[in-house]
Amino acid sequence: MSDSQQSVEVLNQLLARLSVATPDNRDEVATEVSSFVNGNIIEHDAPEHFFNGLAKAIKDKKSAVNALAAVSHVASTSGLAPSVEPYVVALVPAILEQTGSKDKDVQSAANAALHAVVTAVNPVAVKAVLPHLTKSLSETNKWQEKVAVLSAISALVDQAKSQISLRMTELIPVLSEAMWDTKKEVKNAATATMTKATETVENKDIERFIPKLIECIANPSEVPETVHLLGATTFVAEVTPATLSIMTPLLSRGLAERETPIKRKSAVIIDNMCKLVEDPQIVAPFLNKLLPGLKNNFSVIADPEAREVTLRGLKTLRRVGAVGEGDVLPEISHAGDPATTLGVLDSLLKTENIAKKFRPAVEYISCIGGDLIDERIIDQQTWFTHVLPYMTIFLHQNQAKEILDEFRKRAVDNIPEPPKFDDEEEEGEDLCNCEFSLAYGAKILLNRTQLRLKRGRRYGLCGPNGSGKSTLMRAIANGQVDGFPSQEECRTVYVEHDIDGTHAETSVLDFVFQGDVGTKEAISAKLKEFGFDDEMIVMPIAALSGGWKMKLALARAVLKNADILLLDEPTNHLDTVNVAWLTNYLITCGITSIVVSHDSGFLDNICQYIIHYEGLKLRKYKGNLSALVERVPSAKSYYELGASDLEFRFPEPGYLEGVKTKQKAIVKVSNMTFQYPGTSKPQISDVSFQCSLSSRIAVIGPNGAGKSTLINVLTGELLPTTGEVYTHENIRIAYIKQHAFAHIESHLDKTPSEYIQWRFQTGEDRETMDRANRQINEDDAQAMNKIFKIDGTPRRIAGIHSRRKFKNSYEYECSFLLGENIGMKSERWVPMMSVDNAWLPRGEVIESHGKMVAEVDMKEALASGQFRPLTRKEIEEHCAMLGLDAELVSHSRIRGLSGGQKVKLVLAAGTWQRPHLIVLDEPTNYLDRDSLGALSKALKEFEGGVIIITHSAEFTKDLTEEVWAVRDGLMTPSGHNWVSGQGSGPRLEKKEDEEDKFDAMGNKISSGTKKTKLSSAELRKKKKERMKKKKELGDAYVSDDDADF
């Protein structure tokens, strides 16, 4: 085929036949056109004349349908020749114009032709097609044309997914504008296309939020909630332009929200994401949308802390984006722009005298070259594959290769080199060798760090609490770490802290069997290796103690034949026997393991390498924890409790009336037995003990011995089956459960500040309202029917309302029901008037109405001025005493906190009411070495009593003096100093608080200053001065002295 006279005649005939073709022979003629045009081309010729005529025919109403049919056939995916492709793409604007035609036949043919073109072009030539589509979408007023364009973009995503991902920066704005179109059809099509386009955002961290992000574009009212959701997201995958292009609309709107917390959270996310970006060109296209919002917020936000956070985000964005002085935005790189590559190509072709008719092919090549540059494809062979067929349209093969290679070299000179790994000199099979970044919502944890793991090695993962140890382990298990092998290549099993409560009634055997890890016989055999007997294998999981539950989770993980075992605090809830068994198993099993543990002895015994968090990198050290301390002295706090500079403080407990020394018992239990309903024997039997403000008690014993049950009875969570439990009327007990997260698991979408406000908003601790010692049961209801003889009338107590001092005890104001016809069928009890209320001594009332008395005691204690104002500042200051900064307390949802941070929150909330007795069940779980040392110091200095259940002898050896050994339901105390009265020691005096006091409604209580009583000599002197002054002034004298009246 050539542009010779003969070819021109053939093309003219085909065009003429096409213009007069009928619907019956249209396809036949169009097929002939396609065959001729796509046929073998004579070297250095192009069908320019034909396509110019075809463009005119498309615009002609009479021949448009036939011409568009010809385009559809020419652009068939099986037959489009490289020599024709540039000229077909040049027809796209004319085709787009006809998609909005009022003639339905023309419109239908144009839609078909457009779809044929976008699905037939070379994927790397997307820069030649997409600008036509986005320009039409932005400029046209025809809704049918917009719908056609949106459909074409969706088809282009399927055709060139990776190439479209690089164009998301320019695509998202025009699609967003189409989503706001007033025409319903356009709006729906735009939403569908946006959803399709976001399939190119291959970022596992945000892919589940993409529907929400799209919804935010159409419905701005969803922005605040989505900002909160993203605040608790772990960013692990590389942050690409495609990721930023879908995030920027949300963040720019978040910065413009009215609520300061949303503005603040948006600034934090911007700060966090920018830290993961090393190339300024990645953020450059988004600076004009994010920078002004941050600058404006910094100047108008009133909250100083929020302004500081905004400034931090602003500084990071300026630094990463290479923003110049005076906030001059940097120039965006144009290395991949078709205009730039066209300039390079034109300079190389200047001496070749390329005919004008080949100009479409030259421009097409520049678009392909621009895309290859954007994709960072620099190898010669790929360029030859994608570009050479188009260059041979106007050059000989050898000449085309020579010029193309020079074009490639000149065009890719500014592409940065990819990152290189520093290979370790270490023998053995690699299971993983990758570089990645890790963030958790608003906090950057790791940035472009390397992780290399060998088969059969045992690694300890060490770092401060909140540094991201558990987050990294979970990200590995969920396949969210870039470059980490998939589960098919390398089976990785994550052992959870605890087994999900939904399996409570599932038997041990069935729970493991559900994991598809083998036959029940094989599972039973393996469970027995872990210490389970036949009876335990069939019992429900709920019946297992915490230690056995952890062993079950470990057994299940081992049965999955893991290549890598991820163990997060595996010694939690395990006694020393089970820890020794686990140590031996990990050393002998030959499975690669990564262990996070706060048990320094355990890490010393099992680790061959320590992976240590240093800055935002992971660094590997050969040896165990002791070896790490020798090389990194700052890691000493992981090894020795108390070596850290971190400090905790517990609030000073309030004054207890009648307690003159720290030795006096404030809790006393006598001959107490407890048995769960339906069990064959008591869990604890015949236990007696007492606690005082000076108590420092360690409760020890094997798993399942009854330690937690004993404490539950002491704190009122359970009622004893037999025996007596006395607690001081005004005592406040802080109880942190073994599974500390139970306190907060239903409040994960609150901030820590909001949780504390919810918990104490009534003045009482809402977490304790459902305790057994506050619930009225049948026995209580029966006892409350007791009849009192008052003023000669039979009465029952209807309510207890207040309390006052009475001798060495108290008496209570009671309202009554008056009995009539007692013992008869017509017996009834009539409410009496408030004027008939009477005061009864505590001893008389407590026998039958003990729980009602306890309620009044609690309210009186709160009304005595020991209530704290639930302000943000007060809560932040209290939480700071337990190592939580204001950022986490007021601006991060509980769901986004690390395990250690959640435990600190539980400690802070539990001690909010300034308790007299702190009860900790397994406090070493989930806290890092720094926090454990700080907790140990704080408990030593605490002015109240402390009871600790723990398996960690290291934690309690310097802290506790008294030991309660629990075994088989029996408790044996040692080291105790129980006294029957006040005991010896310094006398306690009631302190007048220097701080402001508040009542239960938050009102400030102003306590008047007591006047000092004057002596008789001072009174005489004062009287003389007064009389002298009166004599001098006469009638003008006015006294303000009380003594004159």
From Swiss-Prot:
A GO cellular-component term linked to this record: cytosol
Membrane-traversing stretches: none
EC number assigned by the record: 3.6.4.-
BP-aspect Gene Ontology terms: cytoplasmic translational elongation
Subcellular location: Cytoplasm, Cytosol
Keywords: ATP-binding, Cytoplasm, Elongation factor, Hydrolase, Nucleotide-binding, Protein biosynthesis, Repeat, RNA-binding
Pathway assigned in UniProt: Protein biosynthesis; polypeptide chain elongation
GO MF term (any one): ATP hydrolysis activity
Superkingdom of the organism of origin: Eukaryota
Residue sites binding ADP per the record: 42, 44, 83, 392, 396, 703, 922, 925, 951
ABC transporter domain residues: 426-641, 667-993
SUPFAM superfamilies referenced in this protein's UniProt entry, alphabetically: ARM repeat (SSF48371), P-loop containing nucleoside triphosphate hydrolases (SSF52540)
Main location: cytoplasm
InterPro entries: AAA+_ATPase, ABC_transporter-like_ATP-bd, ABC_transporter-like_CS, ABCF_EF3_subfamily, ARM-like, ARM-type_fold, eEF3_ABC2_chromodomain-like, eEF3_chromodomain-like_sf
Span list, region Disordered: 975-1045
Catalytic reaction list: ATP + H2O = ADP + phosphate + H(+)
Biased composition (Basic residues): 1020-1031
Family from the record: Belongs to the ABC transporter superfamily. ABCF family. EF3 subfamily.
Biological function: Ribosome-dependent ATPase that functions in cytoplasmic translation elongation. Required for the ATP-dependent release of deacylated tRNA from the ribosomal E-site during protein biosynthesis. Stimulates the eEF1A-dependent binding of aminoacyl-tRNA to the ribosomal A-site, which has reduced affinity for tRNA as long as the E-site is occupied. Assists translation termination by stimulating the release of nascent protein from the ribosome by release factors.
Protein name: Elongation factor 3
Gene name linked to the record: TEF3
